[in-house]
């Protein structure tokens, strides 16, 4: 689940939240529209605390259907294990993202490099550096 999360994070961030062509004509504030605009407000006002973490309802829209599909395909253990990984990765993402914006520098180079990469995404080039918790997919898709 944790590994799958990195791909979901990259895909969502790059192809949904930064793809202006994907904006539906009519938004339902309970669906992607609210999250899409919230993300762009986060870019405009990057240091507002309430725009840093992903809303719980958006997380549930991913975890609940994933659990149901995995439960019917592979059973309870796989569904629980995979979703536990997704949940842990989400907590890691929210914690790291919050720290990137409001914490100091990291003593561990890996985390400091991720923070600097994320700040580049915000302030230099919004078409690069989509991975927040990992640079792996940015290297794979040449967006580093």
What are these regions (language model features)?
Residues 1-6:
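Loop-to-helix transition at the N-terminal end of transmembrane alpha-helices
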Residues 7-144:
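Membrane-embedded catalytic scaffold of the fatty acid hydroxylase/desaturase
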